[in-house]
Regions:
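Extracytoplasmic/lumenal domain signature
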Residues: 1-27, 31-70, 74-435
Length: 435
């Protein structure tokens, strides 16, 4: 089924708030497995019914804390992988939510997304701009099923001064590509690495890049793509042996940590404005770029009242529809993304081949008690339901509903009615007083 396409037809299916206390007890972005949503908060993983938001199972206490919970849980081979701090990963059974193993303590924060490939997971640690962090590989095999606290040692690790922050990897059969921090926002000291997937041995590296690489590496049609805090989008050609080819860069005009989405020679990415990362009026924008064999260029950009810091989602559900009545499919795609400012909702952009301008629309605005900053990516199930969280510690499910109210009028027999808040379709409770 298709995702919601207007603020009138999107409705909140449910919203569940965990009993989080403090930023270090925030919940992770959601992970969908079958009919359930999995999130972690503090030292626990919660399995929730995705139709109701009810918690149906809670894990045993994990060995560490999920800390700021910016990275979702990862899943592979019947296991959930949680980043519990101290440079450690804890594996739990997705069925029983009991511990299977805990990786060796490397120190620092585990802030990079986990990548799985052929029985191994990969992620990185960050300590500070001036101290080393490690990118490391772990076998997911549970060598001793009789113990839940066995220590899993790294298959390999690769160290870099400045470490790895939000640096998700692309894994092929034989090489792994990931980026590093550089210790300075606009210096030529970050590195794009390609290492042997099995041994961690260096295959190639690029050092001519500006700014921290704080995005996951996207692969498409022989190229890898990523953004930097120095304000660049890069495209790097990949050779079959894991070495790098030609590099194309585009100056976005502001910092970017959003993982780029690449589709049919278009690239979609969120960009921080120059007026302050947390200032809603800071000049933030969402960019649509064109790519060709010769390089990258801007198709257009749209203003957003907040920094679109997380990866967008692209929907092709309506790509074959004819919206302009010319008898041909328009090729329209829909982009959905969050932004790191109040009220912490969702924006949407439509794009078609050759489009040179556009306007982002507010798709969903949380009710007041659910409003907060948001650095979370969106998660979508096969029914088109959107799941996400913001810093209010609410996990929300949003679906399409063709029936909606665009206004409500209350008329007393005498006097006048005062509403406690302005009517909006997403708000379900109001207090009315007759004066």
């Amino acid at each position: 089924r298709a995702m919601p396409t207007s603020k009138n037809t999107i409705t909140q299916k449910w919203a569940t708030r965990l009993d989080a206390k403090g930023w270090d007890a925030a919940l992770t972005p959601p992970l969908i497995l079958g009919g359930y949503v999995y999130v972690a908060s503090g030292q626990f993983i919660y399995k929730m019914d995705k139709n109701t938001g009810d918690i149906v199972q809670t894990s045993e206490r994990m060995s560490g804390n999920m800390q700021y919970a910016m990275i979702p849980l990862a899943y592979a081979e019947g296991m959930l992988f949680a980043q519990i701090g101290g440079g450690q990963i804890q594996a739990l059974s997705a069925t029983t939510l009991k511990s299977l193993w805990i990786s060796e303590k490397l120190g620092g924060q585990t802030l990079s997304p986990i990548t799985y490939k052929n029985g191994y997971i990969y992620t990185g640690t960050w300590n500070s701009d001036t101290t080393p962090g490690s990118y490391f590989c772990l076998s997911v095999t549970d060598e001793d099923p009789s113990k839940g606290n066995e220590i899993k040692y790294c298959t390999w690790k690769y160290d870099h001064k400045g470490g790895f922050y939000w640096a998700g990897a692309y894994a092929s059969e034989n090489y792994l590509v990931f980026g590093s921090d550089d210790g300075a926002g606009d210096a030529y000291t970050s590195i794009l690495y390609s290492v042997n997937t099995h041994t961690g041995q260096l295959i190639d590296k690029r050092t001519d890049l500006i700014g921290d690489i704080r995005s996951t590496i996207t692969y498409n049609n022989g190229y890898v793509y990523f953004t930097t805090k120095g304000g660049y989008l890069y495209r790097v050609a990949m050779n079959a042996d894991g070495t790098f080819g030609a590099v194309a860069g585009y100056n976005l005009g502001g910092a970017a940590t959003s993982t780029p989405v690449v589709y049919k020679n278009r690239i979609y990415v969120g960009v921080c404005g120059t007026g302050g990362q947390y200032n809603a009026d800071g000049g933030h924008h969402f960019d649509v770029l064109k790519e060709s064999a010769s390089g990258l260029s801007l198709a257009y950009k749209v203003s957003i009242p907040g920094y679109p810091q997380a990866a967008p989602i692209l929907s092709t559900a309506y790509e074959n529809q004819d919206f302009d009545g010319d008898g041909k499919a328009d090729g329209r795609v829909y982009l959905y993304f969050t932004y790191n400012a109040y009220p912490g909702g969702i924006y949407m952009l439509t794009d078609t081949p050759g489009q040179t301008s556009g306007k982002a629309e507010e798709l969903f605005r949380p009710v007041s008690k659910q409003q907060e900053y948001c650095i979370s990516p969106l998660c979508v199930d096969k029914d088109g339901t959107i799941y996400y969280k913001n810093d209010s510690c609410y996990l929300m499910a949003l679906e399409t509903n063709g029936a909606y109210l665009d206004s409500v009028t209350a008329r007393p027999d005498t006097g006048s009615v005062n509403w406690d808040k302005r009517f909006q379709a997403s708000e379900t409770e109001y207090t009315l007083r007759v004066a």
